Amino acid sequence: MRTDWVAKRKNDPIRTQMHYARKGIITEEMHYIAKRESISPELIRSEVARGRMIIPANVNHANLEPMCIGVASKCKINSNIGNSSVVSDIAGELEKLEYSVKYGADTVMDLSTGGDIPAIRKAIIGASPIPIGTVPIYEALSRVRRVEDLSAQVMLEVIEEQAEQGVDYMTIHAGILVQHIPLTTKRVTGIVSRGGSILAEWMVKNHKQNFLYECFEDICKILQKHDVSFSLGDGLRPGSIADASDAAQFAELKTLGELTQVAWKHDVQTMIEGPGHIPMDQIEMQVIKEKELCFEAPFYTLGPLVTDIAPGYDHITSAIGAAMIGWYGASMLCYVTPKEHLGLPNREDVKAGIIAYKIAAHAADIARHRPGVRDRDDALSRARYRFDWKEQFALSLDPETARSMHDETLPEDGFKDAHFCSMCGPKFCSMNISAKVESFTADDAAAVLSGAAPESLVNIE
């Protein structure tokens, strides 16, 4: 799709969507997204120009279908895939990608930490019509013997190679600083971000400042060259509700705001990663704080989980928080699967996480009154009231599951026309009963109250 669009800009010195937006140019990607979002191309351009929206679209990701992340558009969801040092299988990761696209993920992050990481990433990018994100420090760590052997040079090489492959956005943990580490020592769960913990160990062992912070402008130049977006990582996000909204989290967030302005100076699109584990009463404050400290850059949050007591069900504990934070203004929600805190998710875990987060993001969009976002809900409700089972299945987020649950007790095709399900049966179905009184008017009600003869009232068969 984008091959011709990108080719005609090949001689432009800067090719980021933010650069064009600031020049007043509405790109083909912006026009395409405007149709997908049912908003004007000029609004897309304006939001990208001011940094309140990003279009993660590496110039090297030719088969990408452009999308946007920002408060003026629909709330998006991300699916995490990728292998581990224990389990590595390209075919399995491509299957997870297929599930992610099928069930509605807007972006996918490849978080592979083992095996042939570049080969896995190449396969994923080549197969993906949606933006791909990565955390480059994982691959960088695989190239050195010890954490303390990491360096700016190794990281810059990895970032350049990933950008050339077509990665659309990268998580860079440049906001965790050496002076922040003492703020984490009294936490219940310490530093739970993999990237954050790696960099904390590096700083302590080398007695130096975070090299990602110190070479940040060099990273900006690479990302600008390929139009890769920053996803500024929250290396100090709280990993338990006991640690929510603490000094460490907000010290890093302030630094992320400063780095956002540096990235914008280079016309590099930027979003901010957020928590984590947050009690419900602190969620709105988290959004307000991010907008204030990070100049309204899009907020991309992991959950947040609103309680810590449900391993195996954290797609639910986090979807509750995700719906709330999406309503309050987060632009993208990173899914959590049932396997969170327990193990590497398989494709069914990926599906469960995506469905939970599609629900959360859609609920947030309804609450934010996005134009047309409720149309599907209303259509399904009308089909439900008509007992149009096939239409209900077709309109649902997961038609296969909806159909299989219905058919578990009423499998015969004849029941697809029935005016009841196995929950209530024909006698107690409220909608079936309600349909019988539809012709009862306000005049009929007044007649009842005035004591009119029964024969003069509407007759229900």
From Swiss-Prot:
Free-text comment on the cofactor: Binds 1 [4Fe-4S] cluster per subunit. The cluster is coordinated with 3 cysteines and an exchangeable S-adenosyl-L-methionine.
Known cofactor(s): [4Fe-4S] cluster
This protein's record includes keyword Cell inner membrane: no
GO CC term, one of those recorded: cytosol
GO molecular function, one term: carbon-carbon lyase activity
Residue positions binding substrate: 80, 109, 138, 173, 193-195, 234-237, 273, 300
EC number(s) on file: 4.1.99.17
Residues that bind [4Fe-4S] cluster: 421, 424, 429
Tree of life domain: Bacteria
Pathway in which the depicted protein is active: Cofactor biosynthesis; thiamine diphosphate biosynthesis
Keyword 4Fe-4S: yes
Reactions the enzyme catalyzes: 5-amino-1-(5-phospho-beta-D-ribosyl)imidazole + S-adenosyl-L-methionine = 4-amino-2-methyl-5-(phosphooxymethyl)pyrimidine + CO + 5'-deoxyadenosine + formate + L-methionine + 3 H(+)
NCBIfam families, sorted: PRK09284.1, PRK13352.1, thiC
Recorded family membership: Belongs to the ThiC family.
Role played: Catalyzes the synthesis of the hydroxymethylpyrimidine phosphate (HMP-P) moiety of thiamine from aminoimidazole ribotide (AIR) in a radical S-adenosyl-L-methionine (SAM)-dependent reaction.
Name used for this protein in its record: Phosphomethylpyrimidine synthase
Species annotation: Solibacter usitatus (strain Ellin6076)
Protein's gene: thiC
